[in-house]
């Protein structure tokens, strides 16, 4: 579907953005999250300049995203290593099973 204009409130300001209908709930949740972050920053930093608060919030979000990417990359690397170990274990078990079968076949000949 095509994007529809949606009005959201960010830090007391109205903003109209285009958004596909199926993503409007996610957009609204993101707006709520951003508002909460901005309010929290305003209290913690005592910065009153909205533009500065927005930049600080953007930097914080970028930092969090970078941290999550690192976690995901580490997790994927760990899973790849475990999969390789499992493959080696399975291959070794199959080789041993093949040797056992060969010995049993040789005994019956």
From Swiss-Prot:
Matching Gene3D superfamilies: 1.20.5.50, Cell division protein ZapA protomer, N-terminal domain
Matching InterPro entries: Cell_div_ZapA-like, Cell_div_ZapA-like_sf, Cell_div_ZapA_eubact, Cell_div_ZapA_N
Signal peptide region: none
Keyword annotations of the record: Cell cycle, Cell division, Coiled coil, Cytoplasm, Septation
Keyword Coiled coil appears in the UniProt entry: yes
Biological process, per Gene Ontology: division septum assembly; FtsZ-dependent cytokinesis; septin ring assembly
PANTHER family reported for this sequence: CELL DIVISION PROTEIN ZAPA
Biological role: Activator of cell division through the inhibition of FtsZ GTPase activity, therefore promoting FtsZ assembly into bundles of protofilaments necessary for the formation of the division Z ring. It is recruited early at mid-cell but it is not essential for cell division.
Family (UniProt): Belongs to the ZapA family. Type 1 subfamily.
Assembly with partners or alone: Homodimer. Interacts with FtsZ.
Name by which UniProt lists this protein: Cell division protein ZapA
Species this chain originates from: Serratia proteamaculans (strain 568)
Gene: zapA
